[in-house]
Amino acid sequence: MKIIVLVENTTTCDLEAMHGLSLYIETKKHKLLFDLGPDQTVFENAKKKGIDLQEVDTVVISHGHNDHGGALEQFLEENDKAKIYIQERAFEPHFSKSGEDMVPIGLNSDLKENPRIILLNGDFVIDEELQLFTVESREKCNSEANDVLYNVHGLDDFAHEQNLRL
């Protein structure tokens, strides 16, 4: 198995740092991306690392914030085969509170109509190598940094979040 960080908040090499996350993972059966980061940074850094994102067959979006899935639209344009696994609630509106303002940080909900996007509602087994699981309660893994994050119902409960087990 190989895991390469393509997008992260910090960097110690020639890759561009960006608020967000994208991991390129190779298993025996898959070339996948766990998250896509917020923008074109994932494509630029993949090119620097010699990774052909056209070869990616699976994408897992951890949750519905643009720092983890903002590059989804561009990825769908540049890769014509990967299946994208995402919790259905990830496409609901999400916000970050900045002073008195609620700044949208959600994903483009129009993308959920794409036939390659697989909308999930809870745990899901992709195959014997890849399993997705959710956490029922925000309290189990909450960070104080999340206290400024909201959805249309109030404080973000992260019911749109999923994790990848390899």
Locate predicted features.
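Conserved beta-strand hairpin/beta-sheet module of binuclear metal-dependent hydrolase folds
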Residues: 2-49, 157-166
